[in-house]
A protein has these predicted regions:
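Core dinuclear metal-dependent hydrolase active-site scaffold
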Residues: 1-52, 119-124
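Active-site neighborhood of phospho(di)ester-bond hydrolases with catalytic His/Asp-centered motifs
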Residues: 16-20, 32-36, 55-63, 82-90, ...
Length: 124
C-alpha cells in the first residue's frame, strides 16, 4: 500500500498519524507480498524507537479479517505511546471492542480511545 505517515512535534507534544502505513496482510495476496508488507511496516515502526508519543492515530481495519489487529498491536508493543485513536474502521466501530476483548491488547487497552460515531468530539 502506498501513502504517508507523519510524526509531528508541536507545543512540546509529539503526534503520530499513520496515514495508510499499516501491516497490510491480505489472504488473497501471495506469501511473498505479505512478508514484504510485514517487513516494511516493522522497519518503519522501528524508526519511532525512543520517541515519547503523546497521541497517535493508528490503522485498525476490519477488512483484514483475522489479521485486523496485527499492525495496531505491533505499533503499540514497539512504541511509547500515551493515547491512541484507531482509524480506518469503515464505521465498523465494534472492531475496537473486538481488539479490547483480546488478551493480546492487555498491555495497552487502557490507552485506546474508543470511537463510537462520526463527528465524535474528545477532550484530552
Amino acid at each position: 500500500d502506498e501513502g504517508v505517515a507523519f510524526l509531528v512535534r508541536c507545543e512540546n507534544r509529539i503526534i503520530y498519524h499513520a496515514g495508510d502505513l499499516n501491516w497490510w496482510h491480505w489472504e488473497e495476496e501471495d506469501d511473498a507480498y505479505n512478508r514484504m508488507m510485514r517487513g516494511d511496516y516493522q522497519k518503519e515502526i522501528e524508526t519511532l524507537a525512543g520517541e515519547k508519543i503523546d497521541l497517535a492515530f493508528v490503522v485498525l481495519d476490519p477488512r483484514q479479517e483475522e489479521q485486523f489487529y496485527w499492525g495496531f498491536d505491533w505499533y503499540m508493543r514497539h512504541t511509547d505511546t500515551k493515547i491512541v485513536f484507531p482509524m480506518h474502521m469503515w464505521k465498523q466501530y465494534e472492531v475496537q471492542d473486538r481488539l479490547i476483548g483480546m488478551e493480546v491488547s492487555e498491555p495497552y487497552r487502557e490507552k485506546i480511545m474508543r470511537i463510537r460515531e462520526k463527528g465524535q468530539v474528545f477532550e484530552l
